[in-house]
């Protein structure tokens, strides 16, 4: 199933599930008699709630069906937590080499020496991540808003995982049963700011990642049963219709199962948490030193998940 949040005729955020061969949406709010009010409620409701949605979708009343075409889709849900991982070694290699080549002259030599050693061996020993901000979540029809410090504004195409089952100390072999589904994620980044935030005196990414609409997810939340092999999904980025890069989740240095297992070490994971798997190689502008201009339309696609297009606007 594919879960969406859309605006009803009164402008209210409304949960729905895609039906009729991806041509229509079942309004879950009205079809459930007001019992289902958000997609997060479905995620937190577990198997019983999914069964209820399946029953509603199997016998929908015509009055609860709306055409998908023309609907304004919001972010499918607002996650209760956001962890953003980096598990693509090639992305790091290409990014650091680009910074070494193009960034501040006084750092070129030093950065290049670092770049040829990136990633360090610790990168392969365990997955690394930072905490994101869920208040900056935006959806597939929202704008990318350039922050005041966004001279080098960039996109990052990522596969995101939504947790559907509570768990702690989850073994990799059991990780899949804790997944509710998957999303396309654009981890919008202000690179100039990030250059100042990833140095030795920094606690990690901050304002370079945290600004309005910087975490764009969509177009829908696809349940895990519709994604038989999330570790082998092809993906691409287009800017103004031009293909900027193509990649695959098969290039991860740590699997989704390993990421979930590591995250749950000494800590309980809860339904509704979002785990982003990191920027795919060739699918962010910094690697080729091509950044976004106002008016650009950025389209992110992951086969089997979906695609979304967002326009860059000045802040």
Please identify what each model-predicted range represents.
Residues 1, 5-31, 216-219, 250, ...:
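Charged, cofactor-coupling segments
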Residues 4-6, 37-239, 254:
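Active-site microenvironments in enzyme catalytic cores
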Residues 81, 152, 268, 291-292:
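Residue-level "contact hotspot" at macromolecular interaction interfaces
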Residues 87, 93, 280, 303-304:
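Short, surface-exposed secondary-structure boundary micro-motifs
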Residues 134, 188-189, 279-282, 304:
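Acidic, glycine-rich active-site loops and adjacent beta-strand->loop/helix elements
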Residues 239-241, 303:
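Short strand-turn-strand beta-turns centered on an Asx-Gly dipeptide
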Residues 255-291:
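A conserved acidic, glycine/proline-rich C-terminal tail/linker
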């Amino acid at each position: 199933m594919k879960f969406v949040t859309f605006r009803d005729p009164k402008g209210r955020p409304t949960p729905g599930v895609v039906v009729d061969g991806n041509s229509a949406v079942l309004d879950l709010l009205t079809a459930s008699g007001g019992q289902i009010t958000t997609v997060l409620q479905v995620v937190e409701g577990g198997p019983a709630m999914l069964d209820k949605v399946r029953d509603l979708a199997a016998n929908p009343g015509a009055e609860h069906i709306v055409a998908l075409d023309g609907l304004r889709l919001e972010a499918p849900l607002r996650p209760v937590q956001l962890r953003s991982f980096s598990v693509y070694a090639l992305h790091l290699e290409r990014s650091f080499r680009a910074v070494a080549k193009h960034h501040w002259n006084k750092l070129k030599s030093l950065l290049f020496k670092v770049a040829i050693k990136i990633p360090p061996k610790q990168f392969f020993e365990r997955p690394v991540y930072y905490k994101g901000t869920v208040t900056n979540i935006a959806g597939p029809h929202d704008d990318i808003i350039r922050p005041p410090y966004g001279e080098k504004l960039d996109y990052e195409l990522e596969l995101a995982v939504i947790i559907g089952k509570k768990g702690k100390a989850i073994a990799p072999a059991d990780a899949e049963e804790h997944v509710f589904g998957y999303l396309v994620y654009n981890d919008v980044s202000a690179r100039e700011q990030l250059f100042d935030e990833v140095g030795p005196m920094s606690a990690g990414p901050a304002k370079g990642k945290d600004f309005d609409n910087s975490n764009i997810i969509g177009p829908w939340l696809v349940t895990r049963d519709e994604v038989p092999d999330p570790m082998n999904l092809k993906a691409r980025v287009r800017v103004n219709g031009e293909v900027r890069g193509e990649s695959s989740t098969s290039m991860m240095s740590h699997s989704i199962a390993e990421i979930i297992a590591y995250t749950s070490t000494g800590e309980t994971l809860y339904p509704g948490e979002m785990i982003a798997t990191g920027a795919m190689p060739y699918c962010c502008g910094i690697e080729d030193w091509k950044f976004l201009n106002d008016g650009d339309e950025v389209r992110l696609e992951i086969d089997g998940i979906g695609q979304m297009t967002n326009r860059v606007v000045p802040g």
